[in-house]
């Protein structure tokens, strides 16, 4: 296993563009669009919706969309935070679209989905961080598709009112909130977020509604050490998190945080083995794994385990 290349945080703060990433391996290739991918795009565009698949430049877009899997991003496409790894634009968001829950529900029905993932940008400008809009969207989806399973991937609702009561009362199967990286890198990778608060959010959701499965995801290749990854795994299990996704960080542009290291599938298999041994019910671990990638399959795996 290669030794991780370390770069000082003070240098990174001055200018991300001045720090080069290692050459991307040839095996990190993305599939070309198919006709089924374009069909999904047509349905999404018909309702004038946003997907995190497009906004975050997800490497699995063509794979997921060709199978009619999409992660809908509600509450607009402008985030109030500016995380150094993320491609979503930051600034002052527009007002909330009150018709968005209906639009999402119609798209989900048109796609004939059995499982859907709903996420959002951070909305620090809203009193509840957008929690009530999540609730309304989920309620409308259930009205149009009563038998669907739903996963939500939420921001941290830091310093927001009544979010816990609202979110835990949603008719969801999986609550997902990503830690993204190890505690030591939070101040530069996730400025504005707090590692302990994110853990507390995951634990509180589980404690409030034990029927909801909880999930989190991380990226590797940011300069984290193995001992820090193990500590993160332990923190998640101590918070009773059920699912885990582990993926390779891919730099969206030169203005974003650089890739410190690329890892092959052997390393991801190694991390998965550690995570499974720690007690996670399902782990998706590969260079292209993202938080909502194969979420339907994960949900079925855990349901099967719980029924036996």
Regions found by a protein language model. Give the residues of each.
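Auxiliary Fe-S-binding modules of radical SAM enzymes
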Residues: 1-71, 75, 102-106, 136-148, ...
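Short cysteine clusters
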Residues: 58, 79, 83-86
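Alpha-helical elements of the RecA-like P-loop NTPase motor core of helicases
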Residues: 84, 187, 227
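Core AdoMet radical
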Residues: 87-103, 110-161, 167-201, 215, ...
């Amino acid at each position: 296993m290669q030794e991780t290349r370390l770069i000082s945080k003070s240098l990174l703060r001055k200018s991300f563009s001045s720090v080069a990433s290692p050459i991307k391996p040839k095996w990190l290739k993305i599939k070309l669009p198919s006709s089924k991918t374009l069909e999904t795009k047509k349905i999404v565009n018909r309702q004038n919706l946003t997907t995190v698949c497009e906004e975050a430049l997800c490497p699995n877009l063509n794979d997921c969309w060709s199978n009619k899997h999409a992660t809908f991003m509600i509450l607009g496409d402008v985030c109030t935070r500016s995380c150094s790894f993320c491609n979503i634009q930051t600034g002052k968001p527009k007002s909330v679209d009150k018709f968005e829950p209906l639009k999402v529900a119609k798209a989900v029905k048109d796609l004939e989905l059995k499982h859907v993932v709903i996420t959002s940008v951070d909305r620090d400008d809203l009193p509840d961080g957008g929690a009530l809009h999540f609730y309304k969207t989920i309620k409308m989806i259930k009205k149009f598709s009563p038998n669907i399973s739903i996963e939500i991937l939420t921001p941290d609702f830091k310093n927001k009112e009544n979010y816990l009561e609202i979110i835990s009362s949603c008719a969801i199967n999986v609550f997902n909130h990503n830690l993204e990286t190890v505690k030591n890198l939070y101040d530069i990778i996730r400025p504005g977020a707090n590692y302990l608060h994110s853990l507390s959010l995951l634990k509180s959701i589980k404690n409030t509604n034990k029927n909801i499965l909880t999930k989190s995801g991380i990226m590797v290749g940011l300069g984290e050490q193995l001992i820090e990854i193990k500590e993160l795994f332990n923190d998640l299990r101590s918070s009773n998190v059920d699912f885990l996704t582990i993926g390779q960080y891919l730099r969206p542009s030169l203005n974003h945080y650089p890739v410190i290291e690329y890892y092959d599938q052997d390393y991801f298999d190694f991390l998965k083995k550690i995570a499974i041994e720690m007690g996670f019910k399902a782990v998706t671990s590969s260079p292209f794994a993202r938080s909502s990638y194969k979420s339907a399959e994960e949900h079925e795996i855990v349901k099967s385990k719980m029924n036996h």
